[in-house]
Amino acid sequence: MAGIFDETMLRLRRCQDFELNRTPLCCALSLHHPLAKKDFLTVDDLHGKALMLIREGWNHYVDELRHDLMDGHPEIKLIDFDFYDTEAFNECDRKNALLMAVPQWEAVHPLLKILPVRWDYTVPYGLLYGHKPSAPVKRFLHALAQITERFTENEF
């Protein structure tokens, strides 16, 4: 499975990761949102807007963003939600809010657009797999490691 993660999530879900990159935290928004015509957003663009963030404690990279926005940009209304599912994306569209997202989710909802934000917040993105991967998964990880030249032969 591919996705964003942090160390807490890996521990709680009892899985390992093969990090592919640090992906930027972006904002998803309705195609009809006034900011949707822009190519990128700035933090100032978010002032006076509602920004949906996954609940505190779910990911410390998102929590860092949350705390920085709370401290430095009280003009942004932060809305917590529990889980990234269809309802969260539908709510973003329905409420004309912004939703913290990553570029890899570009096609997740037909009525949403994902825009980069000019800030330096990223989150690990990669493959997640069990602590005891099956032989086919190990072969895949070895092949991926060779392609990316990231790990030694004995690491899996």
Predicted segments, located by residue:
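Thr-Gly-centered strand-to-loop micro-motif
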Residues: 30, 54-56, 101-102
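Hydrophobic beta-strand segments of well-ordered beta-sheets in folded domains
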Residues: 47-52, 76, 97-98, 125
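Central regulatory/effector-binding core of bacterial HTH transcription factors
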Residues: 1-10
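Short beta-strand-to-loop elements that line the ligand-binding cleft
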Residues: 74-85
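Secondary-structure junction motif
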Residues: 49-72, 137
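Flexible hinge/capping segments at coil-to-helix
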Residues: 13-25, 29-51, 138
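Beta-alpha-beta core module
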Residues: 11-18, 22-23, 86-135
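Extended ligand-binding regions for polar small-molecule ligands
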Residues: 39, 43-49, 124-156
